[in-house]
From Swiss-Prot:
Annotated stretches, region: Catalytic: 242-533
Cofactor comment: Binds 1 zinc ion per subunit.
Protein name, as recorded: Threonine--tRNA ligase
One Pfam family named in its UniProt record: tRNA-synt_2b
Originating organism: Stutzerimonas stutzeri (strain A1501) (Pseudomonas stutzeri)
Protein's gene: thrS
Gene Ontology MF term list: ATP binding; metal ion binding; threonine-tRNA ligase activity; tRNA binding
Catalytic activity field: tRNA(Thr) + L-threonine + ATP = L-threonyl-tRNA(Thr) + AMP + diphosphate + H(+)
Amino acid sequence: MPTITLPDGSQRSFDHPVTVAEVAQSIGAGLAKATLAGKVDGKLVDACDLIERDASLQIITPKDEEGLEIIRHSCAHLVGHAVKQLYPNAKMVIGPVIDEGFYYDIAIDRPFTPEDMAAIEKRMAELIDKDYDVIKKVTPRAEVIEVFTSRGEDYKLRLVDDMPDEQAMGLYYHEEYVDMCRGPHVPNTRFLKAFKLTRISGAYWRGDSKNEQLQRIYGTAWADKKQLAAYIQRIEEAEKRDHRRIGKQLDLFHTQEEAPGMVFWHPAGWTLYQNLEQYMRQVQRENGYQEVRTPQVVDRILWEKSGHWSNYAENMFTTSSENRDYAVKPMNCPCHVQIFNQGLKSYRDLPLRMAEFGACHRNEPSGALHGIMRVRGFTQDDAHIFCTEEQVKKEAADFIKLTLKVYADFGFSDIAMKLSTRPAKRVGSDELWDRAEGALAEALNESGLAWEYQPGEGAFYGPKIEFTLRDCLGRNWQCGTLQYDPNLPERLDASYVAEDNSRQRPVMLHRAILGSFERFIGMLIEHYAGAFPAWLAPTQAVIMNITDKQAAFAIEVEKTLVQSGFRAKCDLRNEKIGFKIREHTLLKTPYLLVIGDREVETRSVAVRSREGVDMGSMPLEQFAQLLAQAVSRRGRQESE
């Protein structure tokens, strides 16, 4: 009979097979009441599952990360229960967990409305109040098919067909409603009280636009109502910071239907964009990168050689001319290999670091486009390092150091680094993968920072490092990458002359720090809510006169600051000074300079910050020094 070993090393013996819930009850009534599921020998199981042999057991409660995921998954099933009660003809598709929530795809003959979503949420709350048990039944395949056939759940039957090797499946019953899942799920609906439906959208069956359209209901669920309230507050803050709203408020950019997924940059937004590009150009030059420029439109022949035509054609914009097929480049790497291939390269030329602010275009589905975060036309801070296998570790270590410096300059210090390792389907020997993964792991270790493995998540041809930034709202943004690639140099016949005069293939390291400029600017807008650090702000200082008498000196101040390399402008409108201050505060200009008669007499400026802090009057030279210091700090705090 089983002996159960708990996380603290203590053991409990039973004279009969025992469920997770029964083990929890033997420890204490409080734990039993909080038990969602269990982890038996590292595998998640339902609270009702039997343990028949000696095993280690961790009781899962809402406080555990896995517990939160179980709550969210069970809430998705609860959506199904409510929808089927309200709309009996709806057909349920799938309801997975996503970051901070869940969704359920539903086939129904009309789009859901906000009123429908409110009705579904109300019915879910009513079902939770019934405090019913969720019943799990491991059911033979034939019976599963019978259950869903009798209910007309066509999509569930298709999902069963996708699992030909499964002879028995878990069915979870919410009263009269049944759903299919690997589980585990909550034992009772009382665990689901802290939930909220958040939005509705369209989706396609299996994510393919050629298939039928479905309705998708998104929601979130948490361990308790306090966590839910904090999440809702965070979402409301995120809505206030939406880059589309702030972009319009600050007159940075716009998008329009005639050019879907393309950005119209206005003067202020283009200034911000240029700040990023000039900064990246400087840091790359300081770190040994040579900047290049490659064509936008390239013959199909190159894309066939690189493999993009067969694997990526549906995402490429194509055209024809004079009986030749072309594609607008979706990425820069094949073109960079063409530059490398011009002229004989020696081992003495390596590492060769080639950078381009490459404008790329990808035919993203129209439904996936989102402001400037998800676009069809974008520019990358793209670079490729051609090196020997022995040089990979140092190049990777240098890149990590550079990337972390850049992120710090933009005000991001909470960085997660992950190493994605070999997938099951891959090319290359295990020895090659061992060396490649080992070099990247050693480079990560040299950074002195924590990092983690992502087993099996590498590309089929090589491992990669990913950098994820956490913003002020706790959201994660995957930005930088370093991809090890021995494959493309092989396909495009890149080589160098080794020390022994033999021809060898270089390793190619694909790398980006910001990624898409458009997406990174969208992140910056939301992270700073448009109140950019002085070095990035489109206008760093605005000079405002109180009356026409001070206009000449205001213009002189503007000219002096501009000649010193600052972005300053005058506001000489015949408006009250309070009106001007309010307007430029809303435009989030870092420094507001007010000039009255006293400032003209003393050749000084009265300085206010956009936060409303009165910094007093000071000589123009002193303000210029203050602004220069703020610019030199970039996005770092004064203490850094």
